[in-house]
Curated annotation (Swiss-Prot):
A Pfam family assignment: GHMP_kinases_C
Residue spans crossing the bilayer: none
SUPFAM superfamilies: GHMP Kinase, C-terminal domain (SSF55060), Ribosomal protein S5 domain 2-like (SSF54211)
Cross-referenced PANTHER family: 4-DIPHOSPHOCYTIDYL-2-C-METHYL-D-ERYTHRITOL KINASE, CHLOROPLASTIC
EC category name: transferase
Listed name of the protein: 4-diphosphocytidyl-2-C-methyl-D-erythritol kinase
The keyword Nucleotide-binding belongs to this UniProt entry's keyword annotation: yes
GO molecular function term, any single one: 4-(cytidine 5'-diphospho)-2-C-methyl-D-erythritol kinase activity
Keyword field: ATP-binding, Isoprene biosynthesis, Kinase, Nucleotide-binding, Transferase
Pathway: Isoprenoid biosynthesis; isopentenyl diphosphate biosynthesis via DXP pathway; isopentenyl diphosphate from 1-deoxy-D-xylulose 5-phosphate: step 3/6
Organism this protein belongs to: Neisseria meningitidis serogroup A / serotype 4A (strain DSM 15465 / Z2491)
UniProt: ATP binding residues: 98-108
Gene3D superfamilies: 3.30.230.10, GHMP kinase, C-terminal domain (3.30.70.890)
Amino acid sequence: MSVTDGRQAFPAPAKLNLDLRITGRREDGYHNIESIFCLIDLQDTVYLKPRDDGKIILHNPVDGMPQEADLSYRAASLLQKYARTPTGVEIWLDKKIPTGAGLGGGSSDAATVLLVLNRWWQCGLTQRQLIDSGAALGADVPFFIFGKNAFARGIGDRLDEMDIPKQWYVIVKPPVHVSTAKIFTHEGLTRNSASSIMPTFQNLQPFRNDMQAVVFKEYPEVWKAYSELSRYGFALMTGSGACVFTACQDRNSAYNIYRQVSDLYEAYLAEGLSKHPLLSV
């Protein structure tokens, strides 16, 4: 990765949930899900610089949030206890993934910090150990550590690689922030979808998102964005929202849709990835 003023830059890609079903509520209050997770090339950049004094410093936390509450800071703090030498790190986040969007930006940043510092600090954690550690930070973190398109079960921590056709995506971000906690506690949320017997990309179609109906009811702006995007093809919400997306087989088709919707909404044109960029490093 590139080096600037002693800082090294590492990618943190976004994700889309191409299908998301809630199969039950757990005794601990969390929900069991089944979902297709797909990596896309919309990404943040995480800049890291080693320190030898044991301090962890996040230089640009989200406005109003103490650095200790940021997932990237928490990831570094969590991993520090496994380090073989007393070392610290400075963190800068160049955010391109919108927040509160269902694209996993904060979780991806945290996963990138875990993956890089596991090597830098010679922690020696296996991928499974990193996934288990990442699950304590957020439900999407395990997927980004797994690093490949996947079918997820449990709370998102049981992952199996899934082949997903090469696609382009048009993503629309309505002007609203969806509260994930509000959606998961909503009395109208579907929580009893049947578990998949043979989960493949083809077998799970037509895709759906069990949270979509509740979000549309509580956040009309998401419904409006979905309705607009549905004019051009099959649209779906990712995660708990607020972003909605449609898939295309080629870039030209996606770009034509992007040109139309970007006049009305914050919009993104993204290409699907087969694996996390850090797996190539």
